From Swiss-Prot:
This is Urease subunit beta. HAMAP family: Urease_beta. It comes from Prochlorococcus marinus (strain MIT 9301). Pathway: Nitrogen metabolism; urea degradation; CO(2) and NH(3) from urea (urease route): step 1/1. Pfam families: Urease_beta (PF00699). Keywords: Cytoplasm, Hydrolase. InterPro entries: Urease_beta-like, Urease_betasu_sf, Urease_subunit.
Length: 106
């Protein structure tokens, strides 16, 4: 009888490098609002809360370079650098704040 649990993943020993080989952009972000803003790992950063001040054009088609299912919290008045990586696949985005609703490459 096996000791494996259904759906269990057993990774190899050592470090796992996220987004290996992807272009990484570093962007300075400031929260100009009076409330914290939290952005998840796969949120289209271009469409993040308007209280976050950053060069939005640089972030079109990008998401945070953090592990899936995690997030970064921006406290009011804070400024921090974040690393972003491009979306892959079809590069089509719908929803979020409805600023794109289509191709990320136009």
């Amino acid at each position: 009888m096996s000791n494996l649990i259904p759906g269990e993943i057993i990774p190899e020993q050592g470090e796992i490098e996220l987004n290996l080989g992807k272009e990484v952009k570093t962007v300075k972000v400031s929260n100009s609002g009076d409330r914290p803003v939290q952005i998840g790992s796969h949120y289209h950063f271009f469409e993040a809360n308007k209280a976050l001040i950053f060069d939005r054009e640089l972030t079109l088609g990008m998401r945070l370079d953090i592990p899936a299912g995690t997030a970064i919290r921006f406290e009011p008045g804070d400024t921090t650098d974040v690393k972003l990586v491009p979306y892959k696949g079809l590069r089509i985005a719908y929803g979020f704040n409805s600023l794109v609703n289509g191709s990320l490459d136009t």
